[in-house]
Amino acid sequence: DTGSRGLGDVYKRQEPMLITFQECCNHFSEKIGNWPVVISGSWFNILPKGGRTERHRHESSVISGAFYLDLPEGDFGKFFVVSPLQPYMMCVHNVRETPYGMYFYDVPIKEKHLYLFPSWLEHGSRTNNTEHDRWTVSFNTSAFSQEMLDPRFVESVWGKGHESS
């Protein structure tokens, strides 16, 4: 990975953007039949020229999200997902390429759009080949409210001395 990350304490901040993200997570959870979730951590990514994010998953999270604040013109390092069916695809003979037969799928992202996905889904970002930075705000969710979490877990995620709201 090449890029900058900043951590923020979502429990101490109540920006309209985070409230909107939580509302979107509530709607998404309802649509897919999940229990409600709460945003448990957030950060921002600045992907400079030549930067990329390797394939990864978000362990100990239910739903993850990425909001694209600023997309430069051109080949800005698209968001991709890895098919969870990859290990089971034997002898695929597609007539044409579709998301159903692909190992990797480049998600057609747009500026100022929020993308939610199950945290177990492997994903990453292609290389930013533009002269400008690509900015995103990302977050994870938990099936528990912060007050229900073990204080040791809270400290490991948000740091020593974190106070519940």
Predicted segments, located by residue:
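Ligand-binding loop in jelly-roll beta-barrel domains
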Residues: 126-136
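Catalytic core of non-heme Fe(II) oxygenases with the double-stranded beta-helix
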Residues: 45-116, 126, 143-155
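Short, cationic low-complexity segments
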Residues: 86-88, 158-165
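Hydrophobic residues positioned within well-ordered beta-strands of beta-sheet architectures
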Residues: 40-42, 63-65, 135-139
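N-terminal onset of structured domains
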Residues: 13-51, 56-60
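Single conserved hydrophobic/aromatic residue that forms the stacking wall/gate
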Residues: 1-11
